[in-house]
Amino acid sequence: AKKIGLVGVQIGSNVNQLNLGEPQFLEFFATCESLGIAVFVHPWEMMGEKDIQKYWLPWLVGMPAETSRAICSLIFSGVLEKCKDLRIC
């Protein structure tokens, strides 16, 4: 991304149902940190999505909950402690 002039990358709020704080993703976040590349976390595969189809609930409840799940995973797993200069948006 950096080589072609991009300033950030996007990742889903989970990868194949794995939280972003899982150890196999640490190298990705450390690399983004060292290159100064921002990471945009986009809600993906919302938990409980099939049960909340009415009233725009997937967008009003599901996406914020999924984003919170991803960020909490990064915080509580220690990724943000290990990658202190990582920019998440």
Question: Which residues fall in each region the model found?
Answer:
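Catalytic pocket-lining loop regions of alpha/beta-barrel enzymes
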Residues: 2-89
